């Protein structure tokens, strides 16, 4: 992932302003350590921090059309760029970058070209011929993007909050699937509006081979790279399928010819964690070069402040899962790898979270999947993008391919419903699609392994250790004042309070706290789905183990009232609050 920053229509074209833009752009350099670029045209500035994945030799940004009247700074990957180039025969391209097509598409089609892009992207385009501009973000928000407004009437755009939060009167997350155009009076326009967006119940019959074909296509197109890459492999269904398909199709690709035909896979976890065991087994089955990274609870706790600074959230489940991903990304980048494929998005599309066992009917099931996909940019996309980008590593997510989402979301949700009495566990339609007896994609027990959320799979003591640490830093008196100190999204647990304190230190603006979602949740549900089971109101925790009666290692946080237990041995040196009685909601 690259880092982009744009300041448009400001009242200052001085050298001091240019220096300030460069200073702010450097805050995004972790996203793109390979090269920096800046373009200034009067009161407009476009800056870029590049992570070179395609055409590393000549693809530096900003990018231009032939006469340099149209300028683009972009963070993204356009998978169909070669096909798009064929339709632009009268245009001359300056680079081999996949993003070079954007300026030329605009020149040919105006602002109506965005839906032609198959990929992930955030970009700012400046048309110097009339001093107009447009900003756009990909369909579901795989790339991160923020928009803000300065006191002088300027418009700011940045890949991360840290690039604009000090200089804007107000800022917010740029909505996925939208564009913002100065030509339309400075308003947002939704360019991505698929049939499933209205949440009406679809009726397409389930065809396993259609799902298989659509997902294989989504993975294959993401093998486009000019740099070393690998796959994140936790041993769960989603990452294992991504790894299996990649291993099958890697031979013969340009990447294989340049870097070798053997796939590299990566896994992280506490010693003895479920993911480490399963990931190793899948790697051996697929024949990948497997890299296992171990961390301790203390390692994770030590990284929390860095994680919150980079991921820019105080959401509990996002921080829990981002921390091991953050640690793993640093290790991966140290090996010279610049891109990884990852399995985010499947649980939202297929209802894979364990709370979906309680969906009362297919309409509720489908509407919850729609809500989850629409909110992905606030949670898993945010994590996958920023936890990896902290070290100049790009994460690609084939489950969030536009065509695959449309195929999967057109299914009659009755086929996705979880029915244990019929042998249908969560994500049954996906598992069945890849259950091939003649040429197996995965071992059966991996193909039908129960869902583990990433923050659980890396080791159950990870979350338990976080809670114990938070309890050492947040006392009951602080919690009693939580609603006064934090009236918006008031933290309900000591762990949430602890993360909020750190977040507010980095991002104290009201606009910043409003970018983070809130509301009731159990096992990563939306607030609406909490209504499915009355008992959940007493056990509000985003961990999958909160799904009592569903998860094999479920716990009931509402029924445990004990002295605070000793934390994991990795944090034994932290003083304990002796004798305090608390309700443990693990």
Swiss-Prot record:
Active site annotation, chain numbering: 2
Keywords: Amino-acid biosynthesis, Asparagine biosynthesis, ATP-binding, Glutamine amidotransferase, Ligase, Nucleotide-binding
Domain named Asparagine synthetase: residues: 194-517
Pfam family, one: GATase_7
GO molecular function: asparagine synthase (glutamine-hydrolyzing) activity; ATP binding
A single Gene Ontology CC term: cytosol
Reaction(s) catalysed (UniProt annotation): L-aspartate + L-glutamine + ATP + H2O = L-asparagine + L-glutamate + AMP + diphosphate + H(+)
InterPro entries noted in UniProt: Asn_synth_AEB, Asn_synthase, Asn_Synthetase, AsnB_N, GATase_2_dom, Ntn_hydrolases_N, Rossmann-like_a/b/a_fold
Domain Glutamine amidotransferase type-2 residues, every copy: 2-185
Superkingdom in the source lineage: Eukaryota
UniProt-annotated binding residues for ATP: 232, 268, 342-343
A single GO BP: L-asparagine biosynthetic process
Biological pathway: Amino-acid biosynthesis; L-asparagine biosynthesis; L-asparagine from L-aspartate (L-Gln route): step 1/1
Entry EC number(s): 6.3.5.4
CDD domains cross-referenced by the UniProt entry: Asn_synthase_B_C, AsnB
Important for beta-aspartyl-AMP intermediate formation (site feature) positions: 344
Chain residues that bind L-glutamine: 50-54, 75-77, 98
PANTHER family, A to Z: ASPARAGINE SYNTHETASE, ASPARAGINE SYNTHETASE [GLUTAMINE-HYDROLYZING] 1
Similarity-based family: Belongs to the asparagine synthetase family.
Protein name: Asparagine synthetase [glutamine-hydrolyzing]
Gene source species: Brassica oleracea
């Amino acid at each position: 992932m690259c880092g982009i920053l744009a300041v448009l229509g400001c009242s200052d074209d001085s050298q001091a302003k240019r220096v300030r833009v460069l200073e702010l752009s450097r805050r995004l350099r972790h996203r793109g350590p390979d090269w920096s670029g800046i373009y200034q045209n009067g009161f407009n500035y476009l800056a870029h921090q590049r992570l070179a994945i395609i055409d590393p030799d000549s693809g530096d940004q900003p990018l231009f059309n032939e006469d340099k009247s149209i300028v683009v700074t972009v963070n993204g990957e356009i998978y169909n760029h070669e096909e798009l180039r064929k339709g632009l025969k009268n245009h001359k391209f300056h680079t081999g970058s996949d993003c070079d097509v954007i300026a030329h598409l605009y020149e040919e089609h105006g602002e109506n070209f965005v839906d032609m892009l198959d990929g992930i992207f955030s970009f700012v385009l400046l048309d110097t011929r009339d001093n107009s501009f447009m900003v756009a973000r990909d369909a579901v928000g795989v790339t991160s993007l923020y928009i803000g407004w300065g006191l002088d009437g300027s418009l700011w755009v940045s890949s991360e909050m840290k690039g604009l939060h000090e200089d804007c009167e107000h800022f917010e997350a740029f909505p996925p699937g939208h564009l913002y155009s100065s030509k339309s009076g400075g308003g947002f326009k939704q360019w991505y509006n698929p049939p499933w967006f209205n949440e009406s119940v679809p009726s397409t019959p389930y065809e396993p081979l259609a799902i298989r074909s659509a997902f294989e296509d989504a993975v294959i197109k993401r093998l486009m790279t000019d740099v070393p890459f690998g796959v994140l492999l936790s041993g769960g269904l989603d990452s294992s399928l991504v790894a299996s398909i990649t291993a099958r199709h890697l031979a013969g690709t340009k990447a294989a010819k340049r870097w070798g035909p053997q796939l590299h896979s990566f896994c992280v976890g506490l010693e003895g964690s479920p993911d480490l065991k399963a990931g190793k087994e899948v790697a051996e089955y697929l024949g990948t070069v497997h890299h296992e990274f171990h961390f301790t609870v203390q390692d994770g706790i030590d990284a929390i402040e860095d994680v919150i600074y980079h991921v820019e959230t105080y959401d509990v489940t996002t921080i829990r899962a981002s921390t091991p991903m953050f640690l793993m990304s640093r290790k991966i980048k140290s090996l010279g790898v610049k891109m990884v494929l990852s399995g985010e998005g499947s649980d939202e599309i297929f209802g894979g979270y364990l709370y979906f066992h309680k969906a009362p009917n297919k309409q509720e099931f489908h509407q919850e999947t729609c809500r989850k996909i629409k909110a992905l940019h606030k949670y898993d996309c945010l994590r996958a993008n920023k936890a990896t980008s902290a070290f100049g590593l790009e994460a690609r997510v084939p489950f969030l391919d536009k065509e695959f989402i449309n195929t999967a979301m057109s299914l009659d949700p009755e086929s996705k419903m979880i029915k244990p009495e019929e042998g249908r566990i969560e994500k049954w339609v996906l598992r069945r699609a890849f259950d091939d007896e003649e040429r197996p994609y995965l071992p059966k027990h991996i193909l039908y392994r129960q869902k583990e959320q990433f923050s659980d799979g890396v080791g159950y003591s990870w979350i338990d250790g976080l809670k114990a640490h938070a309890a050492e830093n947040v006392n009951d008196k602080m919690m009693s004042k939580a609603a006064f100190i934090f009236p918006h999204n008031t933290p309900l647990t000591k762990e949430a309070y602890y993360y909020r304190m750190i977040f507010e230190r980095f991002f104290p603006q009201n606009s910043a706290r409003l970018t983070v979602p809130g509301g009731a949740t159990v096992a990563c549900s939306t607030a609406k789905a909490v209504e499915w089971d009355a008992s959940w109101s007493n056990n509000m925790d985003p961990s999958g183990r909160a799904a009592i009666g569903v998860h094999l290692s479920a716990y009931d946080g509402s029924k445990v009232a004990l002295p605070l237990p000793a934390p994991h041995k990795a944090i034994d040196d932290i003083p304990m609050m002796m004798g305090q009685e608390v309700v443990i909601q693990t």
